[in-house]
């Protein structure tokens, strides 16, 4: 029993000794799991790193492939390097230009390649810069670059001027093209683009310059011809007019007599009326010439008084009043003498004709309104307007100008009343003995 008792503890002790073995075996199972996890983590990290490095390698591959020719060296041929290269400083090698940075287009002995151009604002890039070609830039839509100012793009015009039509649209190299409707002359304030010059066919009938030159030449010739005719007529009329005036006034065409009478006061006011009367279709000069023809053998140039009155009776009846010249009786200043009579004209000229009369004399509507505002009363209005007329025209204001204006307005009665009043007041008289006939 003791042995069993001893064996029992021994067995239990044996179990105690052997017990940790299995526990240690069970506890050793997590040990291998930790390295596996680490292996998985490390493998994942390595995969990520390899993938990223692969991407970086792919991104850098193209520049490296493009840069590879840049570093390529070759020997110059007869001292020159091919396009896309420049010569080294020692002159032994040709060094490739850098893609996208500089270039060379021809065989050269440059120490450095040319820098690539960068497109400015307002331009678009058509093709990038390479080692053998510069960047190609073009103006944006709606703008163009002139040949004489390639540094900037200008806006195209939106339409053609009046009288012209559009025949060409806006391009990056030229503005819109306009031509005249009639002549087809090209109208452009700009220098024509190179494309327009190249595409012009040699079979064009006439250039715009030649057409415009022909038009200008014809216009100038027509203007010169018109001016020459006008000058000739004016000179001829000045020479003939004194003789016509002398014949119509009974002076026998003596220009000296006519000139002396034209220099007298108020004569220049009737020149226009005499010209109008001369140009009227009375056929008086022809009649005079017919009567004078039989008298040529006797050497008499003047008609007898009876014949002259008989032939000129219709014209004399119409122009008898116009030939009577009013002059101051006291040989005073004509304008000042006329001014002294203005106060009585309000009773002689109808009220409705006051403003039309002043307009005929040259006063503006504004001047008439000012004169009416300055007048002291209703009856003083015409006097104030006449004073303003005299102040405006000065020495050109004459009694004959006033009478002619009344005649033009159809106020013949008022004209006759003023003429009678000037004579009866003793301030004016008729020149050359006409006063007696007028007063009778």
From Swiss-Prot:
Coiled coil segments of this chain: none
Highest taxon listed in the record's lineage: Eukaryota
UniProt entry keywords in alphabetical sequence: Apoptosis, Disulfide bond, Glycoprotein, Membrane, Receptor, Repeat, Signal, Transmembrane, Transmembrane helix
TAPE repeat feature ranges: 192-206
First and last residue of the signal peptide: 1-55
Low complexity: bias regions: 60-71
Keyword Disulfide bond: yes
Positions of the UniProt region annotated as Disordered: 1-32, 60-84
Record-given protein name: Tumor necrosis factor receptor superfamily member 10B
Source organism of the structure: Homo sapiens (Human)
């Amino acid at each position: 029993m003791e042995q069993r008792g001893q064996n029992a503890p021994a067995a239990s002790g044996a179990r105690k000794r052997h017990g940790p073995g299995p526990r240690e075996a069970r506890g050793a199972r997590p040990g291998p799991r930790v390295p596996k996890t680490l292996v998985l983590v490390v493998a994942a990290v390595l995969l990520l790193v390899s993938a990223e490095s692969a991407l970086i390698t792919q991104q850098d591959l193209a520049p490296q492939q493009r840069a590879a020719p840049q570093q390529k060296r070759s020997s110059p041929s007869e001292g020159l390097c091919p396009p896309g290269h420049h010569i080294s400083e020692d002159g032994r090698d040709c060094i490739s230009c850098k893609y996208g940075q500089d270039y060379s287009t021809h065989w050269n002995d440059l120490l450095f390649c040319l820098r690539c151009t960068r497109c400015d604002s307002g331009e678009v890039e058509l093709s990038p810069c390479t080692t053998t070609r510069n960047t190609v830039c073009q103006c944006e839509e709606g703008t163009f670059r002139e040949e004489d100012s390639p540094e900037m793009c200008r806006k195209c015009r939106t339409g053609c001027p009046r009288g012209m039509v559009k025949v060409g649209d806006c391009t990056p190299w030229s503005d819109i093209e306009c031509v005249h409707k009639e002549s087809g002359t090209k109208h452009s304030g700009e220098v024509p683009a190179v494309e327009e010059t190249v595409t012009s066919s040699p079979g064009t009938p006439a250039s715009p310059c030649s057409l415009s030159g022909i038009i200008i030449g014809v216009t100038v010739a027509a203007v010169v011809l018109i001016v020459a005719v006008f000058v000739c007529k004016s000179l001829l009329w000045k020479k003939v007019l004194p003789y016509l005036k002398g014949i119509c006034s009974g002076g026998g065409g003596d220009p000296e007599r006519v000139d002396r009478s034209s220099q007298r006061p108020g004569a220049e006011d009737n020149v226009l009326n005499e010209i109008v009367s001369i140009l009227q279709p009375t056929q008086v000069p022809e009649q005079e010439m017919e009567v004078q023809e039989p008298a040529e053998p006797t050497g008499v140039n003047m008609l007898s008084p009876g014949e002259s009155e008989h032939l000129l009776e219709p014209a004399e009846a119409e122009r008898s009043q116009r030939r009577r010249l009013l002059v101051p009786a006291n040989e005073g200043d004509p304008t000042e003498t006329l001014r002294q009579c203005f106060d009585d004209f309000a009773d002689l000229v109808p009220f409705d004709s006051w403003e039309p009369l002043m307009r005929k004399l040259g006063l503006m509507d504004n001047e008439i309104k000012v004169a009416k505002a300055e007048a002291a009363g209703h009856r003083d209005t015409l006097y104030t307007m006449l004073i303003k007329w005299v102040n405006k025209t000065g020495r050109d204001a004459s009694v004959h100008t006033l009478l002619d204006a009344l005649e033009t307005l159809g106020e013949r009665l008022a004209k006759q009343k003023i003429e009678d009043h000037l004579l009866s007041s003793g301030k004016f008289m008729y020149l050359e003995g006409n006063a007696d006939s007028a007063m009778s």
